[in-house]
C-alpha cells in the first residue's frame, strides 16, 4: 500500500515539546472488538487517529478536521477512535485480546504523529495511511478520500 508522508508537519517519537491541553479529541479506542463488530454489521469503516500528547499538529488535525467530521459529515458513516502512540493505555484488540495503545501503534508501524489509518472490522487496512498533517488546504479531502476508500472496500452504500 502506498504511504502518504509529510514529515515536516509530523512529530517524530522522542521529540520534546511542552505538553498541550487538548481542546478537542475523539473517543479513545477502548474496545476495538466491539467497534469491529459494529463496523462489520453496519459495513462502515473505522478511522484510527494515532497521536501523542506533545503534538501540536495532532491538536490542529483534531480541532479543525477530525472532530467536526465525526460529528457532522461522517456521523453514523464511520467510527472514529483515538490511539495514543506513546502510552500503554489498555484496549481490547479486534480479536478480543487485551493489549495497549502503544502495541496497536507498533503493529501498524506508526512512528509519526498524527497518523490516520482507516480499517475494517477485522483491523485490516482499507486505504493508504495518512502520515502528518500534509497540506492543510487538502487535509480534509485526504481524510474524506481515505474514508471513501474504506466504504468502497467494505461494499457499503453511501449514506
Range-by-range predicted roles:
Residues 50-64:
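Conserved redox-active cysteine motifs that mediate thiol-disulfide chemistry
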Residues 43-46, 51-54, 112:
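Short pre-active-site segment immediately N-terminal to redox-active cysteine/selenocysteine motifs
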Residues 47-48, 80, 116:
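Hydrophobic beta-strand anchors of alpha/beta hydrolase catalytic cores
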Residues 41-44, 63-86:
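Conserved helix-turn-beta segment immediately C-terminal to the redox Cys motif
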Residues 106-153:
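Non-catalytic, surface beta->alpha helical segment in thiol-disulfide oxidoreductase systems
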Residues 26-45:
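A short beta-strand-turn-helix
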Amino acid at each position: 500500500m502506498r504511504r502518504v508522508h509529510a514529515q515536516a508537519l509530523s512529530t517524530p517519537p522522542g521529540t520534546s515539546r511542552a505538553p498541550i491541553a487538548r481542546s478537542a479529541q475523539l473517543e479513545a479506542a477502548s474496545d476495538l472488538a466491539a467497534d469491529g463488530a459494529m463496523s462489520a454489521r453496519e459495513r462502515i469503516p473505522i478511522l484510527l487517529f494515532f497521536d501523542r500528547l506533545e503534538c501540536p499538529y495532532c491538536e490542529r488535525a483534531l480541532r479543525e478536521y477530525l472532530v467536526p467530521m465525526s460529528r457532522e459529515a461522517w456521523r453514523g458513516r464511520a467510527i472514529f477512535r483515538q490511539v495514543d502512540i506513546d502510552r500503554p493505555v489498555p484496549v481490547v484488540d479486534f480479536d478480543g485480546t487485551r493489549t495497549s495503545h502503544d502495541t496497536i501503534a507498533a503493529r501498524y508501524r506508526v512512528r509519526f504523529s498524527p497518523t490516520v489509518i482507516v480499517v475494517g472490522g477485522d483491523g485490516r487496512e482499507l486505504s493508504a495511511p495518512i502520515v502528518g498533517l500534509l497540506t492543510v488546504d487538502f487535509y480534509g479531502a485526504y481524510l474524506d478520500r481515505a474514508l471513501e476508500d474504506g466504504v468502497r472496500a467494505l461494499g457499503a452504500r453511501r449514506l
